[in-house]
Swiss-Prot record:
Keywords: Chloroplast, Plastid, Ribonucleoprotein, Ribosomal protein. It is found in: Plastid, Chloroplast. GO terms for cellular component: chloroplast; large ribosomal subunit. Belongs to the bacterial ribosomal protein bL32 family. It holds the Pfam family Ribosomal_L32p. It comes from Triticum aestivum (Wheat). It comes from the Eukaryota. One of its GO terms (biological process) is translation. This is Large ribosomal subunit protein bL32c. InterPro entries: Ribosomal_bL32, Ribosomal_bL32_plant/cyanobact, Ribosomal_zn-bd.
């Protein structure tokens, strides 16, 4: 015969929720620091897209 589960206490719910929040917070901090270190290692805060040579031509006509 099927028996219903016991109800989880509020304190257990709170503890489990806090553990989950801490894990997500630390993963966000870790990923942010990784992105920050990569952008500073290249010497540019906004890295250039692939295939960008960096040379731009000036198309102004001088009279």
């Amino acid at each position: 015969m099927a028996v219903p589960k016991k109800r989880t206490s509020m304190s257990k719910k709170r503890i489990r929720k806090n553990i989950w929040k801490k894990k997500t917070y630390f993963s966000i901090v870790q990923s942010y620091s990784l992105v920050k270190s990569r952008s500073f290692s290249s010497g540019n805060e906004h890295p250039k897209p692939k295939g960008f040579s960096g040379q731009q031509t000036n198309n102004k006509i001088f009279e």
